[in-house]
Amino acid sequence: MDIRLNQAYSFHQIGHREYQEDSRFPDVDAPNQEQRFFVVCDGVGGCDKGEVASQTVCESIGKSMSRVDFEDDFTNEDFNHVLDAAYDALDAKRNSSNREMATTLTFVCFHSGGCTMAHIGDSRIYQIRPSEGILYRSDDHSMVNTMVHNGVLTPEQAINHPQGNVITRYMESVDSDQNRCMATVMRTVDVATGDYFFICSDGVLHSITDDELVEILCSDACDEDKMRLIAHKSEDSEDNNTAYLVSIAEVYTDPVTAESAEMEDEDTHETKKIKVASQNLEEIESIQNVSDNGIWNWLKKMFN
């Protein structure tokens, strides 16, 4: 599968925060058109050195991915090696002044096997097709999202919920590899010319709704102007806000990769087809058992 990209665009804004704790890779507003992967991390506020955590993860992933041949398939095992290296980098940075540093992660990579999307926390990934709308939206690892899924809250009640900043997964330096939160990983071959992939920290989501995002991306404006408008809407956010917009120029598909992706259930080892938001995806998800204390006390970006 040969996926060719248009020029990607990014913004990286401090909002109404005193410090910038978001990081991105590559750290430029208009990267080289040969760039095949994109990362946005949001350092966990209220904890030690969130900006160090987000930058460390971005730099580690950038280093690991520099050795990848994107003309080959980038497997879930390959991604797990990249993620492990990022955790190792966090461990290496750990000291008495930043023992609790942590960050979210969003990652998108285009390769011969399709597109791999991965996230930890509440930074988000969208795949939007102008003719159909949102094909995929990552499912936030957050307290309120869990409450919505369990029927405790309605989506409307969740919007301004007082625990809206509590996340249930995050990347941090831990004492054991067994305690590392793993990512939700999606692989899709349903990629078409004109598709948009949008990845962002949650500060962007404070300023723009899904409907507004779709409206902007489906407009007749050029990609640079679309991203400029999203940045303008986000610049007065109460939070740091960072995003990447990547559009698909052309896709050449061979018969093998055009087949539906499948998911293997790690518990039953049964192979079954799944469909998420109108596209066939492969999901490999390993959920960290987060303690009650960890869930309730990790408040993102709470400085007071």
Regions picked out by a protein language model, each given a short descriptive name:
Residues 1-304:
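PP2C/PPM-type serine/threonine phosphatase catalytic domain
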